[in-house]
Design a protein with these regions (language model features):
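Small/aliphatic-rich secondary-structure junction motif
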Residues: 1-52, 150-199, 219-221, 225-230
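Gly/Ser-rich helix-loop-strand patches that form or flank binding pockets
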Residues: 12, 22, 93-146, 241-249
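Short, conserved clusters of charged catalytic residues that mark active-site
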Residues: 15, 91, 125, 163, ...
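Aromatic/hydrophobic pocket-lining residues that form π-stacking "cages" and hydrophobic walls in ligand
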Residues: 20, 72, 96, 130, ...
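Structural beta-alpha unit
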Residues: 39, 55, 59, 63, ...
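A short acidic, glycine-rich active-site loop
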Residues: 51-67, 199-211
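Fold-core signature of tandem repeat domains
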Residues: 68-69, 165
Length: 249
């Protein structure tokens, strides 16, 4: 498995480093730090002065970046796998996505920036862009890392299931994990049919969803995972959070 571990020196970035102890040995592990060096925005400044300031800032950030990568490398678990360090200049999101394409990565690991919902909507977080646009699986770490023993895997449909099975075939975890596969059937009372007929229709749809999620769980059990399926009716976000709470208790 080819992994890109993107770091920026934040607390969540270091938590992303810590989660590597729970991932399997990488075929290739790339430590990536992207430098977004802004040029001075002062029109009245002489071009040569602005360029000198830019070069000084860039050199300082490069030195800080190299120290960060060395620090991260020293924190990796012994089983992390062959590691290379990459320090690149450019937009963090574009740089990470470009490297994922370039290296044909199987997984991108990084920490969330923690902008908050308002700033994230206005500016767009790096992690959100990676999650949306990455050509491979992504693992976004938001908060202190705990041992990875149970995984809740919500699936919306066949394309989700195929992507999940494809990734899990890589055996990405260092130790055995228990998988709970979940599908949520959003349901509102239709104008027709009504009463007992509507209830029967909902029951039939839930049975089909249960069969579907169990069939995916069976595929994962066939490749060595402990897996079971859960199908429920309700609002997806609410039901997923409730299931996560149940698994933690």
């Amino acid at each position: 498995m080819k992994i890109i571990l993107a770091v920026d020196g934040s607390d969540n970035s270091y938590e992303a480093v810590h989660i590597m102890k729970y991932l399997a040995r990488a075929e290739q592990l790339t430590l990536l730090h992207a430098l977004d060096v802004s040029r001075p925005a002062y029109p009245e400044m002489l071009p040569e002065v602005a360029e000198e300031i830019y070069k000084t800032l860039e050199q300082s950030m490069k030195e800080d970046g190299e120290r960060l990568l060395k620090r991260v490398e020293s924190l990796l678990p012994l089983h992390a796998g062959p590691t290379t360090k990459q320090l690149r200049i450019g937009s963090p999101a574009k740089t990470i996505l470009s490297m994922a394409e370039e290296q044909k990565a199987d997984l991108i690991v990084m920490g969330a920036r923690g902008l908050g919902p308002i700033k994230e909507r206005l500016l767009g977080s790096v992690s959100h862009r990676i999650l949306t646009l990455a050509p491979c699986s992504t693992l976004i770490v938001d908060g202190p890392v705990k041992p990875v023993k149970q995984i809740l895997l919500p699936l919306e449909g066949p394309s989700d299931a195929e992507a999940a099975v494809r990734f899990l075939r890589l055996k990405p975890f260092h130790e055995a994990v228990e998988l709970t596969l979940m599908t949520v059937l959003p349901w509102t009372e239709p104008p027709w049919p009504s009463g007992a007929a509507a209830e029967a229709a909902a029951t039939e749809m839930l049975e089909k969803q249960t069969e579907y999620i169990e069939s995916v769980a069976e595929r994962l059990r066939a490749i060595g995972y402990q897996a079971h399926g859960v199908a429920v009716v309700g609002t997806p976000a609410t039901m997923i959070l409730q299931q996560a709470t149940t698994l933690r208790s």
